[in-house]
Amino acid sequence: MLPKSDNSLLLRTDFSDDAAWAALCEAVRVPSEEGFQAHLDCISDPVYDGLTVEQLVTLVPKGGDRDHVFAFVADRIALTEPEQPILVVDLYDEPGRTFRVIPREMWGVENNLSIANMDYSEFADNADPDGVFRGFPQS
């Protein structure tokens, strides 16, 4: 089971660098220029060490009320790449579908998905060709 929380979850699945984890948790909490920020619980529990997307999906009960319809994952890529691209996993509409998001865009993803203002696919479909969401195109 996933932890109960009123906030979205950022699950640590790579425990190789404590400083990188601390830096990532700090980066995702930086407010946007407009003052928006992600509402997250940074979960560092060794029970999630090495957790795969497939395993994460199985932690969500089938049917009934769900506390979390998506989750953020701090895997090895998020903790080692310069842009810190965090994995975003759909746990509801298309369980297991993923894209990545950079910390400065995390607030928009978290805020909009948590209140169902936007759909998961709107962010996933606007990720760059490398699978990372860096914001919507400027019009």
Model-derived features with residue positions:
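Short linear, low-complexity motifs centered on an aromatic residue
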Residues: N126-S139
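Short helix/strand-capping turn motifs
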Residues: M1-S121, S139
